[in-house]
Amino acid sequence: MSNGQLIYLMVAIAVILVLAYVVAIFLRKRNEGRLEALEERKEELYNLPVNDEVEAVKNMHLIGQSQVAFREWNQKWVDLSLNSFADIENNLFEAEGYNHSFRFLKASHQIDQIESQITLIDEDIAAIRNALADLEKQESKNSGRVLHALDLFEELQHRVAENSEQYGQALDEIEKQLENIQSEFSQFVTLNSSGDPVEAAVILDNTENHILALSHIVDRVPALVTTLSTELPDQLQDLESGYRKLIDANYHFVETDIEARFHLLYEAFKKNQENIRQLELDNAEYENGQAQEEINALYDIFTREIAAQKVVENLLATLPTYLQHMKENNTLLGEDIARLNKTYLLPETAASHVRRIQTELESFEAAIVEVTSNQEEPTQAYSVLEENLEDLQTQLKDIEDEQISVSERLTQIEKDDINARQKANVYVNRLHTIKRYMEKRNLPGIPQTFLKLFFTASNNTEDLMVELEQKMINIESVTRVLEIATNDMEALETETYNIVQYATLTEQLLQYSNRYRSFDERIQEAFNEALDIFEKEFDYHASFDKISQALEVAEPGVTNRFVTSYEKTRETIRF
């Protein structure tokens, strides 16, 4: 190793030693500062006037729970002052030794433990001092609270005494609880003045709770007593009185246990008085509600029968008239059927329908007569009679609807006859008009499609007239043939217009094609074919298609122009 390298090594070692010394001095100073701060905190805690506070509470000569609480907190202070502070002192001395011997990690760990110990002692001392302060102040605090409680109690006593009649069976139990609260006040005074304010505070808490609970009871009882002793019995008496009057007026009821339900309600009132007496107010309120529901149910029964009686009277007054009206309608229907049977073949269902209705009306009449005859001495509840009579009314309404339906069908027969005769005459005239209309067109011939439709329509119109001339007209057959003839006439009219339209347009297009025939062989050829179809086959639609297709090639849109012009000036068939 060269001299230069040796010098560098020695310098590096010297620098490291200097740095190590500086670090050691820094750590030692820092630990010393922390130890001094902990020593100051320990002294501050130790010098707190806890002993004086303990002596002050001890001189109060506490007893009972207060004395037990004091002893516990005093013992805790003794343990802290004798043991915990000594442990901290030893740990401080040990940490200083570690720090002076440059064992900085152990010193730092020891300092951390001391900080935790001092923090715990600080919290314990604070708890001890707060507890001692509470014990010292408890008596005066109790004195302030008891005045408020006494005011509430005296107000409660005064309210009960002035309104004793409102509490009914509950009065004895309320007064008993007032006496118990009075005893609790006496017990509180004894404990608070004899050196046990903690136990006295517990007694005062209970007393305040009892006062509040009893106040709540006193608030609720009058309404419950009024309901149970006055309102519900009055309602029940009114119900009983009303029930007797209804019975005297020959009312009957579906329910057969009404008397028993009255008795059960009176028994329920008596039993619920016991709930009031024992201050079981929730039960009393529930039972009152149940009784009210039962009374309402009975009231609904009576009002139902009273309302039903009025409905029954109205139905008994109107149903006979309604029934008589329907019998008259049925007689008229029978007369209509007899009259129509002289001219028309009516289905047997019409007559049998009227006969069935007549039978049903007779049975309904017997039922109405029976109910009416029993009204002087009714044997059923009016609600039952109401249901039966309303059912009878509904059935009569259904029968009336049937009568209306039959009447409409009978009336429609004559209307259909008149309509068919009018249509037959119209169709005969239309056939003649269409024939003349076609003849005036001077067509080279009539297409077979037209002739077939014309003769079919003519034959069906003739069939319709034959049906109408029968001695006994079958209106169903007439209606069927009329529908066929109507469809034929519509088809014939449509075909007539089509034939005339295509024939006329074909003639116009053939004439218009003359301007192209001299130089357009294709149009000349189409002209010849279209003319041949027109004059020999009489298929005017095909002839129109042939010439129009050729002209469209030479002059697009020409066909539409002719069609539009024709539709504006087309001659209609004048029927």
Swiss-Prot record:
Transmembrane segments: 9-27
Keyword Coiled coil assigned: yes
Gene Ontology biological process terms, A to Z: division septum assembly; septin ring assembly
Subcellular location: Cell membrane
Membrane topology category: Single-pass membrane protein
UniProt KW keywords: Cell cycle, Cell division, Cell membrane, Coiled coil, Membrane, Septation, Transmembrane, Transmembrane helix
GO CC term, one of those recorded: plasma membrane
Extracellular topological segments: 1-8
A Pfam family annotated for this UniProt entry: EzrA
Cytoplasmic compartment spans: 28-575
Superkingdom, taxonomy of origin: Bacteria
Keyword Transmembrane: yes
Cleavable signal peptide: none
Coiled-coil regions listed: 110-191, 265-301, 354-416, 456-526
InterPro entries: EzrA
Family: Belongs to the EzrA family.
Entry function: Negative regulator of FtsZ ring formation; modulates the frequency and position of FtsZ ring formation. Inhibits FtsZ ring formation at polar sites. Interacts either with FtsZ or with one of its binding partners to promote depolymerization.
Protein name according to UniProt: Septation ring formation regulator EzrA
Taxonomic classification: Bacteria, Bacillati, Bacillota, Bacilli, Lactobacillales
